[in-house]
Amino acid sequence: MLLAIDAGNTEVTLGLFSGEDLERSWRITTRPDRTADEWAVMLRALFQEAGLDITETDRSILASVVPLATEAIADGVVIATGTVPTIVTAANLPIRLEVDEPLTVGADRMVNTLAASRLFGVDTIVVDFGTATTLDCITKDGRFLGGIIAPGIRTAGENLVRRAAKLSATELGPPERAIGKRTDECIRAGLVFGAADAVDGMVRRIKAEWPTREVPKVIATGGLAPLVAKFSAEIEEVHPDLTLQGLRLASQWLAQGGGR
C-alpha cells in the first residue's frame, strides 16, 4: 500500500493506494506547529477509524509547499508506518521544467502536471483551486512550460472580509444569479463567477501563447473545482484527486528505477 501526502498551505491531503486504486483519502487542516509525534498519532487514528491496517503501508511519498511542516510530517510517517517517505523534488520527477527558476516551482504543481501528461497523453492546462489558483502548462511529452499563479477563491474572500468592515464571511456555493439581492449573495457571486471568468480569461490567454499546434485540454482539480467548473466555459473535466494520482505515478516511476 502507498501512502501519498500533499501538504498545502491550507490543507494536507492524504491518499492510500492499493495499486492504481485510491482506497481512501483524507483532508486535514495544515498546522506547521504539529510535531512528528502528533502526526504519527493522527495517522494511526485515521487508519483505525477507517478500519485500515497502517502496518500494510510499504511505501510513502510526500509533496510539500510548507517547509516548516515537511520534516515533522515525514518523521511522523516514519513513526506511524515504518516507511521513509520520498520527498518530491524537481530532480526526481520525469518532467522537464522549461522555466527560468525551476527550484521555485511548487511540488504540487509538478505532480499535477506529471499526472496530466501521464493520464491524458495530450497537451494540458491544469487549473488547481487551492490557497492560490494555479494554471500550469504541460505538453504531452512532459515539458512543463510554466503557468499562472492567482489568489485562491477562499484567500480572496477572507482578505475581502478582513479589509471591509461591513462585510462578513459567506459560505461558498453555487450563486443563483449574478445580480445579488443580499450582501452574502453579492459576495458569493463575486467569488464564484469572478473565479470562473478569471480562469476562462487566463486560459484563453495561455492558449493564444501555446507553443505547439495542439489545442491544450483544460482540467481542474482542488476542493472548489467542481463548484467553479459549473460556471466555466473553458474547463473540460474535473479530477479532484489529480495531485494524489500524480504522487502515485511519481512513486511508481521511482520504484521502477526512475530518477537515478
What spans do the regions from the language model cover?
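Short glycine-rich, Thr/Ser-proximal phosphate-binding strand/loop in the N-terminal lobe
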Residues: L2-Q48, G142-S168, G173-R177
